[in-house]
Amino acid sequence: MKRRELEKKLRKVRVTPQQDKYYTIGNLQWAIRMINLMGIKCVCDEECSAAEVALIITQFSALDLENSPIRGKEEVAIKNTLKVFWSLLAGYKPESTETALGYWEAFTYREREARADKEGEIKSIYPSLTQNTQNKKQTSNQTNTQSLPAITTQDGTPRFDPDLMKQLKIWSDATERNGVDLHAVNILGVITANLVQEEIKLLLNSTPKWRLDVQLIESKVREKENAHRTWKQHHPEAPKTDEIIGKGLSSAEQATLISVECRETFRQWVLQAAMEVAQAKHATPGPINIHQGPKEPYTDFINRLVAALEGMAAPETTKEYLLQHLSIDHANEDCQSILRPLGPNTPMEKKLEACRVVGSQKSKMQFLVAAMKEMGIQSPIPAVLPHTPEAYASQTSGPEDGRRCYGCGKTGHLKRNCKQQKCYHCGKPGHQARNCRSKNREVLLCPLWAEEPTTEQFSPEQHEFCDPICTPSYIRLDKQPFIKVFIGGRWVKGLVDTGADEVVLKNIHWDRIKGYPGTPIKQIGVNGVNVAKRKTHVEWRFKDKTGIIDVLFSDTPVNLFGRSLLRSIVTCFTLLVHTEKIEPLPVKVRGPGPKVPQWPLTKEKYQALKEIVKDLLAEGKISEAAWDNPYNTPVFVIKKKGTGRWRMLMDFRELNKITVKGQEFSTGLPYPPGIKECEHLTAIDIKDAYFTIPLHEDFRPFTAFSVVPVNREGPIERFQWNVLPQGWVCSPAIYQTTTQKIIENIKKSHPDVMLYQYMDDLLIGSNRDDHKQIVQEIRDKLGSYGFKTPDEKVQEERVKWIGFELTPKKWRFQPRQLKIKNPLTVNELQQLVGNCVWVQPEVKIPLYPLTDLLRDKTNLQEKIQLTPEAIKCVEEFNLKLKDPEWKDRIREGAELVIKIQMVPRGIVFDLLQDGNPIWGGVKGLNYDHSNKIKKILRTMNELNRTVVIMTGREASFLLPGSSEDWEAALQKEESLTQIFPVKFYRHSCRWTSICGPVRENLTTYYTDGGKKGKTAAAVYWCEGRTKSKVFPGTNQQAELKAICMALLDGPPKMNIITDSRYAYEGMREEPETWAREGIWLEIAKILPFKQYVGVGWVPAHKGIGGNTEADEGVKKALEQMAPCSPPEAILLKPGEKQNLETGIYMQGLRPQSFLPRADLPVAITGTMVDSELQLQLLNIGTEHIRIQKDEVFMTCFLENIPSATEDHERWHTSPDILVRQFHLPKRIAKEIVARCQECKRTTTSPVRGTNPRGRFLWQMDNTHWNKTIIWVAVETNSGLVEAQVIPEETALQVALCILQLIQRYTVLHLHSDNGPCFTAHRIENLCKYLGITKTTGIPYNPQSQGVVERAHRDLKDRLAAYQGDCETVEAALSLALVSLNKKRGGIGGHTPYEIYLESEHTKYQDQLEQQFSKQKIEKWCYVRNRRKEWKGPYKVLWDGDGAAVIEEEGKTALYPHRHMRFIPPPDSDIQDGSS
């Protein structure tokens, strides 16, 4: 029916025959809205039929409206309106409501007659069913059984199943009293074991009294049916949904055509739904939700109430209070009329006595029979049901339809059994009284069991009693300010009206609001004078506030909340959106502020800076600085790329130095594969994020800057920042701290929404249909704090976020192209490498062609020429970045595998999901010379950590090679921290090197290297042949150079034995696979051409053959560098000069140190160039001079030192004589004299006080600073200082300090002055007991305490520096000790603490060597030669790891342990046992 036609017909129907009021479309809409409120779907549209409206009327009539807010007149009005609507749709033309009701009664009568006729036909077909129907009105089972077990057969005729009849009887008995409860579900599982789908449906519909339970079961089964249909689309092999539910088939067809699996699936669906309904019904209610039923005996109600109160965790006084009041307030109307005159303080016995006759007729009769039995009177009343109309109606009433809770709107329970209870302490949902933390007990003024509607239950478009309550801390005026207040026992929605004095409600609320009627008052308004009714002492509650007010009732179109209520609940009114305030965070500084002068700017930049400052000043981001602000930071402007607009920057380097820095909250970018899949995705960019957060008032003066005009046209303008400035070190930390709190609040309000934050970029994802509303809500929340999120910064579905391109299901890198510029500066190359590193998970190409160009480059503006390999590397990057591949996100439960591939200059890895890569990268190999296994394990640990960060779970690994090679390589690894689960794939990956253990029958090369000054010598020895090379370098480079020389000269299979652990470990771990630099790179290039290289190690200087010869060769090479000879023949004409590169490297060497041969008329001058001695030869003679190749033409003074030493030991000459006679430097001559012991004894100079020094020799003394006594001790070798504040200068305090010193450090010798506290017997005895040498200096000679005296001065300087930052002397002393012992002060070198640790390490090594020498015993052995003959016994010179060196026939030989058998040393004193 069309809307206009329906409206015309409604206006012709009178509400009552006596009045001229007619129905309108608004009355119908009101009735439909109330029907929807009760959970019944009712839609008034053009396609609505009379049958649908009749079904709605039947459902509404079956509802339990006992405690609902719509009962009485409103219930009758709703039914009458719906019946009028039905009569119009049915084709009738009612004149009034009574006429429509008559049409409805006639219709229902015809329906009952038709149903009775149909039942009669079925009974005539099955006479056996009539046997149990004669007492239908006496038993409720037969009353509730409306659906008979008539099953349609395959040919269409009904059949009777006697077993089904028994099952129906069992089900009817099980659901008679409590409906579908847990007991009934158990019975249902038994009786439906062999039933088909149609029979199960018939069984459920046979209990019309509990039709709501059946409807709930059917709705849950339909949900499972819909879910199965969706699942069936992706699983075609599964049974059809129609086969499971038996749709379109008779019972016989279901029993024959449908499989047992389908029937069992439907049966399980029904049982699961019934169990959910039963569990939802039988939740234990709290005392607040217990109400007495209309026919329930008062005794039963009190028993339930007491049982609930006993289960509460509350004080006894609270339980007594609730029992007194709830026993009256929650009683039914009959009991309340009796109990209210008695009052709440009446004893419970009197209440029970007064209400004993209240209840159903059955309970009254039972009470009367029990009373008569106690009196001994035989009851003349038969034990049958009373025949009163009320009792008969209560026992034989028709089937009850489903029940619905008007509190939460859900079916299956009533309001008194609702699970959504509230705490009776504070009135808030979500917890019980036992867990309540609120101290507000005044809310008991209002009925706390009144439910407060929530946004999840109702929507704003529903009735006024169902709108969500508005609970802000303020009231916004951008829309009508409606709020809800609990007044007089009901939630009332009203309009905030600051012009009204009182609360004015509609007249409809007069009967609903609890209060005392008062005197009516006159209201004067726009429409004139109006008389309003009044109620006083009306209790109200809003949030946590309560009170008592007067309420007026008049003919007002909307409820109004006036100032009598608003003054207690409203804090402020505002129309602005930005209402939240951001509290600035305090910032600490150390030292004075920056005072850097402003440098001059060009006129163009000055004008641009003026415009920017003007805009910032107008926006309030900066303000004028005070006249007495002495701080200043330079400011400048640059042009933005692309737009050409000017941008202001500040040089905050000085301010950043004095600012106490905070910790940034962001630990890095989120990994895009770890972002969860969702249906909707949105990215938001916050504009001017830093400029939104205020800067602390106390810190703003430190950010001052100046705008200096051109040519000093006028005074400078001074400004300071009011918000976070760009470039300041603490701006990111303060921004992250502030926004974190806002984001956390958003996440709490939307826990199912995915929200990522990285600086000012937000990523929002969800699976909700109202995703856009959530995004808008988040934007509004950010906007309330002042953060701007412009529309042009919002991206949806396919977003570009922090360098990635994301869709709800996929991700990839944003397409880009790297510019190839040749040549380019170091700075530009660094930026290019950084861009390549960013996209390496996509490209997975090693960057060594680019990074090798950056070695030893310190000048950022230096030009670099790209190599062809570098250009090719960048081109490969551009090829893959032109259109990056889309990748999947990580799914929950999916197996993650990391595949590792070895490349010459790195390790390539891929994170696989279902065999597809979703992340990857390259781990470059550094130059730490570590072995491959360590590097791979370290890489696996890093990758596992990355996957844990990305997904929260660990991954397995897929490695190249075989498990046998991997396990064999792991056995050589000594320090394994963690072994991950690994799998292997076939790949030519070699875990072991060409280098291995020493093998016999191979040529063996002994290598050694040494260093003297800056000159290094490398030597190898093999079977009497020696080769050496001198070059500038280190000890390690010399050792490696010797190995490189041996590899170049050696055969394809050879052995190399070295005494360097560094070289041995590096060679053993396959150096050819590592991209090392220098000599390692040379070795790596040579090794692939070798078949096998055996590497061994022997200790140095142990007299081992081969190693001794190599060591002597090193010494000889270093000594031979002193005589100077030309590399090529030289011919000098008279007066000719010629330059000569000697190839001699020695630190401190000078040309004057060399002496030419006496027979050569050559003048020699020169200098040191890059530590190399370069000479200039001048022929001062008259003839040609020819110097042959390798001919020594001058010698160094070093060769004269032994002769000078020997001469001095014989004649004890003075240093001056040694200088003139042997041409030595005076410093060396004095050293020769100083080392002579005879000259020391015969000296006649007076002995002054000495200043003893040495390892673990401590000097101690006391000093005073600011009236404080400080005990100081200094370790003379390292300068390590230990100090402690002591209360007085006594021997006891010094002894305690010495004990603490010994506890921390090694003390072998203590030296002090002759003070009484240091020479006391207590100190002497303590040192003697501890085994410490105790000495004292010469009296009154401060030189004997020079070290500790200098420490006094340094310590006091540091104490004065730290005094202002510390509250106590002890704290300043701790800082001073850390500064003296562990800080280098910018001068480099070792700290005193590091020098002391080296001394400790040396002491430990000496102890180990002494212990080893004591435990060393003489070893002898037998050896097996190539002919497998045993020879011996031979003495073992050295026993190593896997091999030993023996003395064989006067020569040394190396044998592996497998060819040796050790025996006890032979002893000539042991006699033969046979004698």
UniProtKB/Swiss-Prot annotation:
EC annotation from Swiss-Prot or TrEMBL: 3.4.23.-, 2.7.7.49, 2.7.7.7, 3.1.26.13
Residue ranges of every copy of the Peptidase A2 domain listed in the record: 492-565
Residue ranges with Low complexity bias: 130-147
Impact after mutating K1226R: In strain: Isolate R29-106 and Isolate R29-Nadin
Keyword Repeat attached: yes
Zinc fingers, Integrase-type class: 1199-1240
Catalytic activity reported: DNA(n) + a 2'-deoxyribonucleoside 5'-triphosphate = DNA(n+1) + diphosphate; Endohydrolysis of RNA in RNA/DNA hybrids. Three different cleavage modes: 1. sequence-specific internal cleavage of RNA. Human immunodeficiency virus type 1 and Moloney murine leukemia virus enzymes prefer to cleave the RNA strand one nucleotide away from the RNA-DNA junction. 2. RNA 5'-end directed cleavage 13-19 nucleotides from the RNA end. 3. DNA 3'-end directed cleavage 15-20 nucleotides away from the primer terminus; 3'-end directed exonucleolytic cleavage of viral RNA-DNA hybrid
DNA-binding region coordinates: 1419-1465
Outcome when changing V577I: In strain: Isolate R29-Nadin
Zinc finger annotations (CCHC-type) as residue ranges: 403-420, 421-438
Biological function: Matrix protein p16 forms the outer shell of the core of the virus, lining the inner surface of the viral membrane. Capsid protein p26 forms the conical core of the virus that encapsulates the genomic RNA-nucleocapsid complex. Interaction between incoming particle-associated Gag proteins and host dynein allows intracellular microtubule-dependent virus transport toward the perinuclear region, prior to nucleus translocation and integration into host genome.
Subunit and partners: Interacts with host light chain cytoplasmic dynein DYNLL1; this interaction is critical for intracellular microtubule-dependent viral genome transport.
Protein's name according to its UniProt entry: Gag-Pol polyprotein
Species this chain originates from: Bovine immunodeficiency virus (strain R29) (BIV)
Lineage: Viruses, Riboviria, Pararnavirae, Artverviricota, Revtraviricetes
Gene name linked to the record: gag-pol
